[in-house]
Amino acid sequence: MRLVFTGNCVFKRLLHTEIGGKYAKQQPRNLKGRSKSSQEWLTRQLADPYVEKARMMNYRCRSAFKLLEIDDKYGILRPGDTVLECGAAPGSWTQVAVERTNANGKQERAPQGAVFSIDLLHFHAVPGATIFGGMDFTSSLAQKRLREALQDRKVNCVLSDMAPNATGVRMLDQESITNLCYEVLRFALAMSAPQAHLVVKVWDNGDVPKLERDMLRFYEKVKRVKPRASRGDSAEHFLVARNFKGATDS
């Protein structure tokens, strides 16, 4: 099965227009002939405050606010940190990571970090980040490329917003996203600095408690988090693991 990793955000045409220096929402037009799901998507986008905030703050996707909330609460990103991000397209988490770690060097008096972002999809460059587009993180070649790019640096935070293409078969989809989490965990164990952090996306299912227990073997704390920016009807949660203890099982 071929997995497509993405930050769960699709590129859609903006539904806003500039009037008198301020932005006003447009109502969806020409809905006749569109599918019901397309009409529902347009209506939901117009009613979603995070879509508007993302546009106003120049984030590529509303999902930026999920990471912002996690970082505001748990302090996982700091200036000078080295960050690895998996499932990075279209780049909104990358934008946040660059800002919070000062990877773009805009904070003159703060240490400059580094951000490495990978996704199976190609996506536009983010200033301050090293992008690996069109690469399958689970492949040995991709992980070799990441190690080469990191050189001798250890990672202070690993982020994963990866999700497989949903098949509609619940058990298969749950197994697929759990397998992705373990793939990220294994890489994090090999590449993380002491006291590093890890964030992975999960879909609520019976495999999550075991994953939490396995993460607790290597991190001091693990919390299950659903940011306010996650849609209410979404099954997604994030496991936030803090303070890496080392790869040796304790």
Swiss-Prot record:
Q: What do the Gene Ontology cellular component annotations say?
A: mitochondrial matrix; mitochondrion
> Which one Pfam family would you cite for this protein?
FtsJ
Catalytic positions are: 201 (proton acceptor)
Q: What is its EC number?
A: 2.1.1.-
Family designation? Belongs to the class I-like SAM-binding methyltransferase superfamily. RNA methyltransferase RlmE family.
Functionally, this protein is described as follows: S-adenosyl-L-methionine-dependent 2'-O-ribose methyltransferase that catalyzes the formation of 2'-O-methyluridine at position 1579 (Um1579) in the mitochondrial large subunit ribosomal RNA (mtLSU rRNA), a universally conserved modification in the peptidyl transferase domain of the mtLSU rRNA. This activity may require prior 2'-O-methylguanosine modification at position 1580 (Gm1580) by MRM3. Essential for late-stage assembly of mtLSU required for efficient translation of mitochondrial DNA encoded proteins; methyltransferase activity is not required for this function.
Q: What is this protein called?
A: rRNA methyltransferase 2, mitochondrial
Per the UniProt record, the source organism is Drosophila melanogaster (Fruit fly)
